[in-house]
């Protein structure tokens, strides 16, 4: 009987060692999951050892970085070699100089104290962005001088052609103000109030978008809506404009296309930028928006569509601060809340209660006659008398 139990114990012990599974997961570059547009010339790699056993420690690692998924010899830009280290967070890239607007693939092998054989991660990737200021070939674009102080929101457009087969297309864009970009009638990305607030005098963040699937063979159009945002503002209690960071809003963009024949170019001709005005009469972080839906033009960013009263755009002053890639989470729509209660105040105002404090905007349908003015105001609480 004792021999039977001993044999059973040995068998189970052997099974637990051979069945031990080690996975290398959660690959990150600069603590980001497959970032698109990263501007760091010396990024840092991180990974996690995933196992259901205790006391599994990394003893060595080996990182590979290449410009193709198969890590061919010609595409390899870094092989760290087998490094004796427990480090698995912020491992420095020490390979060849990284190129701008280029996709890189990477994987890591890990050795542990529990096995002489290595475990290898799946292949991950990241896309470099505009690594230096000189990669921004375009100038900043703005309205002409006579429209500089207008609170209306300009709609900029630029037409261009794509006649060769492309393998990638990336838009890099930022603004002094807030922007919303479109290509061929479709909104680019889902972030709100881009590029987000920073100390504009010192630093502005740019965003990068993969727009390859949005482009057409032949005629194309890029469109940019530009609002004051945090950059400058009009105050309701002041007749003059309050300049927070500058007198004039502007934006800069690079649409970089890589072709199947090996060419890469920034496709937008800045001399082709023009603008007109649409339904947004004013837009302010502090005072909300005024919109005239009679002026809505849903085809303004469609290729070939002629926008009325277009004006030639102007090149704005260069930005003296630092432009870097957005690393923080952007403002996005997270959920849709329905109204919970309609409250009639003692003075007869209609208050719609959503049941919780929130940041967002209102969507509603109306059968009111054309020309009716609707005013929506927002607040957190009613006063002691129940008034808005």
Language-model features: locations:
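Bacterial Sec-dependent N-terminal signal peptides
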Residues: 1-23
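Extracellular/oxidizing-compartment recognition motifs
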Residues: 22-388
């Amino acid at each position: 009987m004792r021999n039977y139990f001993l044999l059973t114990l040995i068998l189970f012990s052997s099974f637990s060692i051979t069945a031990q599974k080690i996975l290398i997961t959660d690959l990150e570059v600069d603590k980001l999951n497959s970032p698109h547009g990263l501007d760091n010339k010396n990024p840092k790699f991180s990974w996690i050892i995933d196992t259901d056993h205790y006391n599994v420690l990394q003893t060595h690692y080996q990182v590979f970085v290449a410009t193709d998924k198969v890590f061919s010899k010609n595409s390899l830009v870094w092989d760290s070699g087998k490094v004796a280290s427990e480090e698995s967070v912020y491992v420095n890239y020490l390979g060849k100089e990284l190129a701008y607007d280029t996709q890189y693939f990477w994987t890591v092998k890990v050795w542990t104290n529990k096995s002489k054989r290595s475990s290898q991660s799946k292949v991950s990737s990241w896309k470099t962005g505009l690594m230096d200021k000189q990669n921004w070939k375009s100038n900043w674009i703005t309205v002409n001088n006579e429209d500089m102080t207008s609170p209306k929101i300009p709609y900029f457009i630029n037409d261009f052609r794509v006649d060769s087969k492309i393998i990638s297309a990336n838009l890099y864009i930022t603004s002094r103000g807030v922007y919303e970009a479109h290509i061929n009638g479709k909104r680019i990305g889902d972030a709100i109030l881009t590029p987000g607030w920073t100390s504009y005098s010192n630093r502005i963040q740019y965003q990068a978008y993969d727009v390859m699937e949005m482009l057409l063979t032949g005629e194309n159009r890029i469109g940019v809506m530009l609002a004051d945002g945090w950059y400058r503002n009009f105050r309701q209690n002041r007749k003059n404009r309050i300049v927070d960071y500058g007198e004039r809003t502007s934006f800069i963009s690079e649409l970089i296309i890589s072709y199947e024949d090996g060419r890469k170019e920034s496709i937008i001709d800045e001399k082709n930028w023009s603008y007109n005005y649409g339904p947004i009469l004013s837009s302010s972080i502090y005072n909300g928006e005024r919109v005239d839906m009679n002026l809505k033009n849903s085809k303004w960013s469609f290729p070939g569509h002629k926008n009325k009263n277009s004006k030639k755009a102007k090149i704005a002053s260069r930005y003296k601060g630092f432009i870097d890639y957005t690393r923080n989470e952007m403002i996005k729509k997270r959920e849709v809340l329905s109204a919970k209660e309609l409250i009639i105040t003692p003075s007869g105002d209609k208050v719609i209660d959503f049941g919780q404090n929130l940041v967002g905007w209102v969507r509603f349908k109306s059968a009111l006659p054309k020309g009716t003015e609707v005013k929506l105001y927002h607040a957190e609480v009613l006063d002691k008398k129940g008034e808005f």
